[in-house]
């Protein structure tokens, strides 16, 4: 099980990302825009740099909902490989069966 502080940190990052997502997208479109004047582009770069680091989507790490494990994560189920296997074996994940050939 991951430390509670690590899980809390990820929750904080998700909240910050949600709060600043729209503003970050607007600033990035200004920066990437071909017709944007240089002064406005530089101001947008500075404004983007002043946003909190944890508000960037790349700072987020996918974690298992049950254990908080960061590796072996399956997006489709929101679980780590260990807990996914346990849930599948108990029949809690509909439509998923153990491979047999």
UniProtKB/Swiss-Prot annotation:
Belongs to the universal ribosomal protein uS14 family. Part of the 30S ribosomal subunit. Contacts proteins S3 and S10. GO terms for molecular function: rRNA binding; structural constituent of ribosome. InterPro entries: Ribosomal_uS14, Ribosomal_uS14_bac/plastid. GO terms for biological process: translation. Gene3D superfamilies: 1.10.287.1480. It comes from the Bacteria. GO terms for cellular component: cytoplasm; small ribosomal subunit. This is Small ribosomal subunit protein uS14. It comes from Methylococcus capsulatus (strain ATCC 33009 / NCIMB 11132 / Bath). Binds 16S rRNA, required for the assembly of 30S particles and may also be responsible for determining the conformation of the 16S rRNA at the A site. The keyword RNA-binding applies. It holds the Pfam family Ribosomal_S14. Disulfide bonds: none annotated. Keywords: Ribonucleoprotein, Ribosomal protein, RNA-binding, rRNA-binding.
């Amino acid at each position: 099980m991951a430390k509670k502080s690590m899980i809390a940190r990820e929750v904080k990052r998700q909240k910050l990302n949600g709060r600043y997502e729209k503003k970050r997208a607007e600033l990035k479109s200004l920066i990437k825009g071909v017709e944007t004047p240089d002064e406005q582009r530089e101001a947008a770069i500075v404004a983007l740099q002043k946003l909190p680091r944890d508000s960037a989507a790349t700072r987020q790490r996918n974690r298992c909902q049950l254990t908080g494990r960061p590796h072996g994560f399956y997006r489709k189920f929101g679980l780590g490989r260990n807990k996914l296997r346990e849930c599948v074996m108990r029949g809690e994940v509909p439509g998923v069966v153990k491979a047999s050939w």
